[in-house]
Amino acid sequence: MFSASASDIATMVMASAVSATVTTLLIGALSDKLGKRRVFIAGGYILWGLSILSFALIREDVIGYLFPSVSASALCITLVIIMDCVMTFFGSSANDACFNAWLTDGTDDSSRGKAEGINAMMPLVAILCVFGGFMSFDLSERSSWTTIFIIICACFVVMGILVFFLIDEPKIKTDGNQSYFKNIVYGFRLSVIKQNPILYLLLFAFAIFGISIQIFMPYLILYYTESLKMTDYVLVMAPAIVLASIFTALWGRAYDKLGFGRSVVPSIALLMI
């Protein structure tokens, strides 16, 4: 809509990834230090929704009126990148840093796989809801995007409010906590890495997987619409997403029964295929 270039999109993806990583480290350590999860999750979801709503105001007519002496298109692109980082900060604070930690706090070896399986299934369901639910919108119209931003904002704000009433604050011991900054750098110490070689090998493998997804997903829809000239690409994506969601949930249950060692090898083999 702002005639953004491929370089602009790459810059936004890179900045968002850095924001998510740094935020998860800083807020995750702060949550551990304070022994609080719920306030970060609820507050983060609410602010996440409000930051999404701000995109409805980043329009060339609005920006051009407020700043007539600069290129409205260029300023809109810059503001989108900045607000994407702000949105990512709130989202990563709530979800990546604190919700995932809360989920780990509330489960054990007998139930963690089932819970994580359902949790991992949700992004797939969300993709289906977004692309399926918004298919009827004319995305070339600004009003359609404004409506979409309002809907998503409302969902997050309501979810954040519900968090205050629906989840319990886990009992986290903070007496023996190290200093805040020691908690942040703990996982990067060479001695810790040497003590947990398998863990860090798997983290490295997952990082490679994450890089591939970040490269693949932004251009998947463009491939469908521009290269294949498909208008009903959701009908292609939907069956794959549904099957992947079901398999993810079932494999989480299998993980609880098989254990980590016997369940991770088939998972990696499937990814390699």
Residue ranges of predicted features:
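Glycine-rich segments within core transmembrane alpha-helices of 12-TM secondary carriers
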Residues: 19-21, 113-138
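Structural signature of the two symmetry-related core transmembrane helices
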Residues: 39-54, 262-273
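Helix-to-loop junctions at the C-terminal end of transmembrane segments
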Residues: 22-36, 247-260
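Hydrophobic core of transmembrane alpha-helices in multi-pass small-molecule transporters
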Residues: 51, 58, 64-94, 207, ...
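Helix-loop junctions on the cytosolic side of multi-pass membrane transporters
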Residues: 60-62, 163-177
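Pair of pore-lining "gating" transmembrane helices in MFS-fold secondary transporters
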Residues: 1, 195-216
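Juxtamembrane intracellular "pre-TM" segments in multi-pass secondary transporters
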Residues: 171-203
